[in-house]
């Protein structure tokens, strides 16, 4: 049986959070704080290609293969989304992804980008 990495699981949770961010941002356009909705759409659109396993992004994806940095980014970017009702679910999913990234970093896992260079 192959070795299972929690970092890959955290990336999949993060991709689900990106879809929730985009959907919540579209719904949030009709709320009072439109800037949070626009922020969530932009964050979801930028994070999705970085979390998706695309080979041609190469060194750009290296930031998400350092799991401590990925956990801090996911937790930090989710803070503003707690202030608008449609984006709260996405913020919670991003925080779950940050916790899983942190657990995988504590366990000593390394991303695929760094495994290939050894």
From Swiss-Prot:
Disulfide bonds: none
Transmembrane helix recorded as keyword: yes
Consequence of gene disruption: Prevents formation of fruiting bodies.
A cellular component term, taken from the record's GO annotations: plasma membrane
Domain of life: Eukaryota
Function: Critical component of the membrane-bound oxidase of phagocytes that generates superoxide.
Protein name, UniProt field: Superoxide-generating NADPH oxidase light chain subunit
Organism lineage: Eukaryota, Amoebozoa, Evosea, Eumycetozoa, Dictyostelia
